[in-house]
């Protein structure tokens, strides 16, 4: 065992003495040692329950003959930091979490690793770290929140964001906004639609890095405790067979994950995160793969933010296994791909499959809700390296209008709340990319305000930042290259005509190349937002969105 370097032999007596102090007994030195990265925090609901869930996980690992050691990693709440300078920390935390997992795995020479995650960046962060650690491992998702309820309708956090715009437009009262705020989040768990956390949790099951069916179990559902304990047996098998993530993560595995995202109208953040995970696994994956898979994969799940149902209701209907079953029946998944259990994806789906009688959440492919998947990649003179649109959140496939140009989200939000954005406008928020912000913050506050004011179908938004999984409407993000490095979005001026052609996959400013060249000659780079510390290092090393906003390797 790898951990024998820590715990066996004459010279390791001091190490054993220290391990005895934390509860390792004589018989335990013969067990595989496992690191459990727990992203618990009592600062937000998504990860609030992970302290308790970790106890069930560790109990299951011990029952399976392993010895677990728990450690922490940071967790940033997108919902709390949204629309503030704190949002810069969100995507940065993905890299810090991955580094933390790698650091602990290497520092303690553990034989296996488990990532216990919940909020948006903790899922890809722990997954990147588990893959990078080079030992058998898996990622477990803490589960979705239960929906809130007000006046007979189910609520998620997105309804609160949109209520801000409704209040600004005078559509609801201050008292109604307060009631929505009070009732939307009834307890622990991640945001309750097919937003980023639930999208990535499903993607990890499709990849084979999480047990099929586990991640769909809601945070406070009684089944969660039993399934968490059972997961210990899976890791014990993987360690016994030296079955590591890089042994089963293939290009087809990643295409399966992309198809799952497309079929459920999932978050555009999945593009960034799956590109980053593919890099860790040494697998070729590009923006074009997302577009090609989405073209042939219909939307078959009626999930929020664009649809009707919450993630809790998806679990009741049959969960992720039901989605995968439908896609397998239509030949839209590679069922022969192996998973962390050593069995194929198709075998795992059959073991986990169930369907609630009369459910209306997941449809057969021949009765799909939309003929094409939810992700569209646009290119053109505004986005030479690509931009991403979630088509499942909008019915419009073309748009042309004048640019309303803002160099920060705050400036755009001010105009939206003052009612100064008009139907037909194209709101442009730039200098908020991976390097520019830095950290590529999400624009949910401003996009929700636009929708809340009733302008969703009539206003487009472009940004070199990104969007929450809760965003809906004609919102195009991940524009690459970003403004900070001199991408064409930096050259836009107020009133420039912008054309969006979804069918043709084009995003263009209607200016001659000569004019763009004149503006490019006048453009000057901006000073960095940070010159010292973590954010300065991140901005110096991060790559563009079309590469997953991963950090540069030195070689």
From Swiss-Prot:
One MF term in the entry's GO annotations: magnesium ion binding
Pfam family, one: ILV_EDD_C
Signal peptide from the UniProt entry: none
Top EC group: lyase
Keyword list, A-Z: 2Fe-2S, Amino-acid biosynthesis, Branched-chain amino acid biosynthesis, Iron, Iron-sulfur, Lyase, Magnesium, Metal-binding
Active site: 468 (proton acceptor)
Reaction equations catalysed: (2R)-2,3-dihydroxy-3-methylbutanoate = 3-methyl-2-oxobutanoate + H2O; (2R,3R)-2,3-dihydroxy-3-methylpentanoate = (S)-3-methyl-2-oxopentanoate + H2O
Keyword set includes Transmembrane helix: no
A single GO BP: isoleucine biosynthetic process
Residues annotated with N6-carboxylysine modification: 121
Cofactor(s) named in the record: [2Fe-2S] cluster; Mg(2+)
The organism's place on the tree of life at top rank: Bacteria
Textual note on the cofactor: Binds 1 [2Fe-2S] cluster per subunit. This cluster acts as a Lewis acid cofactor.
Enzyme Commission number(s) from the entry: 4.2.1.9
Self-association state and partner proteins as the record states: Homodimer.
Protein name in the entry: Dihydroxy-acid dehydratase
Protein's organism: Thermus thermophilus (strain ATCC BAA-163 / DSM 7039 / HB27)
Lineage: Bacteria, Thermotogati, Deinococcota, Deinococci, Thermales
Chain's gene name: ilvD
